[in-house]
Amino acid sequence: MVQRKVLFWSIVTALGGFLFGFDTAVISGAEKAIQQLWHLSSVEHGFTISIALIGTVLGAMFGGIPSDRLGRRQTLRWIAVLYLVSAVGAALAPAWVPFMVFRFLGGLGVGASSVTAPLYISEISPAESRGKLVGLFQFNIVFGILAAYLSNYLLANVGEHSWRLMLGVQAVPAIAFLLFLFRVPESPRWLLLHGRLAEGKDVLRLINPATVEADTAAILTAQALAGQQSESLWASQYRTPVLLAVAFAFFNQVSGINAIIYYAPRIFEMTGLGQGAALLSSAGIGLVNFCFTLLGVNVIDRFGRRTLMLVGSLGLIATLGLVAMAFYTQRFQLFGGLLVPGLLFAYIAFFAFSQGAVIWVFISEIFPNAVRAKGQALGSSTHWVMATVIAFTFPYFAERLGGGNTFAFFCGMMVLQLVFVLRFMPETKGTSLEGVEKTLVMH
């Protein structure tokens, strides 16, 4: 049974995931109005969509630095401030350039939260429920995506400035996130790593009073072993977790997930749906994502990370292959015009159950304490570099190569992911962070 305090701290920290998801998806309802308002070319339009992702890449690359130096909790507070400033600034932006600046700041918050939030939750969670608790971050991401899609749908017809309202409502959860963060403690592993033994033990006592001494000894022993080795992430003993994190994050994005999240209304319009139906279908994607992430998070500690990835990979291969065939044959009117939306709903279900539920859990588990923030930053930045590439190039390739070839590429990448999971992915369920370190790190 998870301590109520640990659950509360995890839920609060996972609010960073809600803002992450909302910020990611909200632009899908505003992008066409923004393009028309400022008369953007296709290149400028692509840059407008991807500027937040560029900020996200930088936030992910460097988010481990304040997390290590200032602490996990203080870094999360600054992330909340970035979300708030971005939401208000983008909603009130008088021109394209300041709009881009504020979207960039929001991207920094997304990137840094993808490093610090899973990291913090993994460091306060007991081994037997770590998957579920860290999975709250991904659950809140998709909850944020769903909320953004529904918000966009409800605000779409309120007037010519509806896109400003779509972007501005994000300020409300950002304020809540900032205020609640003053009720969470610092990570006990970060405190012990920085020699603050009494404070670290106090937090461990709040987590599980019966195991304070054993947990402290295990963490300090692991840190002592790490202290005999290089703290550089690129040292040879960290080769296995580094390769696992990079590969996992790479495959997460070449599944095409963010192309579908960002451009869902346009993809549906390509199949002949009207704008209103396309926006509503996008909200359906958010709902499916929400439900199957909830399922994945609830079973990840029972069936394990690897099993979820195997099931998901097979489902993604099947659905992407069928979507590609639909575009090749142009038979969009089958099943009342709902063939492609139905297949993409199934695609989202398989993704949410597997990659969506697993990625932040797995990457937060596989690095030792001394380099965990750096490793999380590496996995997150790889994820966001690929997300930026996909978001920036998807409109171009969909137009030049067609939907069939584009979705066939994503399908091929998922075949490679299946091989990766079968050959190289270890199982980490039910193992302490220090136990995972013994398995993956060469001492």
Language-model regions, residue ranges each:
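Alpha-helical transmembrane bundle of multi-pass membrane proteins
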Residues: M1-A198, A224-H443
